[in-house]
């Protein structure tokens, strides 16, 4: 088995969070009621756990995710109405092509790829 890391994201509304991540390309692979496991079958994995009242203030949510994908534009097209930065996706000074969205609990989700070094 390869090593991998999986984020466990708290959510006060699992149905809303599930719908959001499905738009990004995830699907539910296991549902335990208050705990759901999502994947895209290409390498992304995510666990959602129900935490009532989390976060108290959405803008105070300290969590973030970076989802690497080759076809950034295809994912952006599925969530274009949610993209935070106008004109995104675009190249960033730190060498990525990316965009950002916020999930229903305020988790910052960046979707991008590393630009060619050539």
Label for each model-derived stretch:
Residues 8, 27-34, 90, 116-118:
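Conserved catalytic-core motifs of GNAT/GCN5-like acyltransferases
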Residues 22-29, 83-84:
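Conserved acetyl-CoA-binding loop of GNAT-fold acetyltransferases
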Residues 8, 49, 93, 100, ...:
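Short beta->alpha transition motifs characteristic of CBS
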Residues 12-15, 65-108:
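Vicinal oxygen chelate
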Residues 27-60, 108-113:
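Conserved short beta-strand elements that form part of the metal-binding/catalytic scaffold
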Residues 1-16, 63-65, 112-118:
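N-terminal beta-strand motif that seeds the catalytic metal site of vicinal oxygen chelate
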